[in-house]
């Protein structure tokens, strides 16, 4: 346990649930930053199509998200290969589901409504962040008894 966590744990209102949400917001912020910066680099610097850029940004951010969520947000411990396989497959499976939501909303906002690519990316990240938290908290990293 980190020194920061030890200090925060002394606060009477600081619970494990608050810690989990706070860490998710911090790690989710980094994940979102990776996603948006990667998307921006691909679209504005490399001049790639937004659909390709969105896919590359998704891969980069999901890889970061898995390790940061496992270690810092949900503090998941999977001692057996079977548990590790279940956790990894459910994480990437649900992230792929939210990627489809992301992709479809991006097409709707950009091609359908004519919204700026970067603004569309920011709005879809809000939707995806909420969905990913719900899936991670109650399905993927759920404490098994």
UniProtKB/Swiss-Prot annotation:
Keywords: Cell membrane, Membrane, Transmembrane, Transmembrane helix, Transport
Main location: membrane
Superkingdom classification of source: Bacteria
Membrane spanning residue stretches: 21-41, 52-69, 96-116, 121-141
GO biological process: one example: polysaccharide biosynthetic process
Alphabetized InterPro entries for the sequence: GtrA_CellWall_Glycosyl, GtrA_DPMS_TM
Keyword Protease: no
Listed Pfam families: GtrA_DPMS_TM
Membrane topology classification: Multi-pass membrane protein
Entry GO terms, CC: plasma membrane
Compartment(s) where it occurs, according to its Swiss-Prot or TrEMBL record: Cell membrane
Recorded family membership: Belongs to the GtrA family.
Entry function: Involved in the decoration of cell wall teichoic acid with galactose and glucose.
Record's protein name: Cell wall teichoic acid glycosylation protein GtcA
């Amino acid at each position: 346990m980190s020194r920061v966590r030890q200090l925060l744990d002394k606060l009477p209102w600081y619970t494990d649930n608050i810690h989990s949400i706070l860490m998710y917001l911090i790690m989710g912020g980094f994940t979102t930053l990776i996603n948006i910066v990667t998307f921006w680099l691909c679209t504005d610097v490399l001049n790639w199509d937004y659909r390709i850029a969105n896919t590359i940004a998704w891969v980069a951010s999901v890889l970061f998200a898995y390790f940061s969520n496992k270690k810092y947000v949900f503090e998941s411990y999977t001692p057996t290969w079977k548990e590790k396989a279940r956790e990894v497959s459910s994480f990437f499976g649900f992230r792929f589901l939210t990627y489809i939501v992301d992709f479809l909303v991006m097409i709707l906002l950009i091609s359908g409504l004519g919204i700026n690519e970067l603004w569309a990316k920011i709005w879809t990240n809000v939707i995806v962040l909420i969905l990913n938290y719900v899936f991670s908290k109650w399905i993927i990293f759920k404490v098994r008894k």
